[in-house]
């Protein structure tokens, strides 16, 4: 084990931002902010940025290459989940209770909370959950 790693220690590291590749950044950023009831995305350089809690940003960019689907999970409150799930249903979005998509049109009640999986316009697998899995 390398010297910089100390088992059991927690280092003061915070997550700041990530970039999600999109076929159409405006479409993906708008989908994301509407579904999660966030402020409208803001342009910053080549990105459209959506602000989350604790100063975290999700930035959408168009890389000009084929998009490889990724998984992004977002921890939300029970009240926020209610709104998100209702917006998914109202929009007629396909959604699942599990990442294998074996339980369509449902949400799960794993780990003492609720969770739902769905896809964004570029095919990324998004998840909204109310209790962390780990």
Where are these predicted regions, by residue range?
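N-terminal beta-strand motif that seeds the catalytic metal site of vicinal oxygen chelate
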Residues: 2-26, 71-72, 132-134
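Core segments of cupin and vicinal oxygen chelate
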Residues: 12, 19-58, 64
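Short glycine-enriched loop/turn motifs at secondary-structure junctions
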Residues: 12-14, 65-69, 109-110
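Short aromatic/hydrophobic contact patches that present stacked aromatics
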Residues: 17-19, 49, 57, 71-73, ...
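Hydrophobic pocket/interface hotspot
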Residues: 28, 32, 72, 88
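Conserved beta-strand in the GNAT
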Residues: 58-61, 117, 126-129
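A short, sequence-level motif marking secondary-structure junctions
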Residues: 62-67, 133-134
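Vicinal oxygen chelate
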Residues: 73-121, 125, 133
């Amino acid at each position: 084990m390398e010297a910089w790693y100390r088992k059991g220690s927690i280092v003061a590291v915070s997550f700041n931002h990530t970039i999600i590749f999109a076929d159409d950044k405006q479409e993906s950023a708008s989908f994301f902010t509407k579904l999660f009831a966030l402020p409208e995305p803001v342009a910053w350089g080549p990105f459209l940025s959506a602000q989350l809690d604790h100063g975290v940003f999700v930035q959408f960019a168009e890389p000009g290459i084929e998009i490889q689907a990724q998984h992004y999970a977002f921890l939300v409150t029970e009240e926020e989940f209610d709104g998100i799930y209702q917006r998914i249903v109202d929009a007629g979005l396909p959604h699942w209770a599990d990442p294998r998509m074996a339980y369509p049109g449902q949400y799960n009640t794993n780990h003492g909370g609720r969770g739902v999986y769905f896809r964004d316009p570029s095919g990324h697998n998004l998840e909204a959950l109310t209790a962390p899995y780990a």
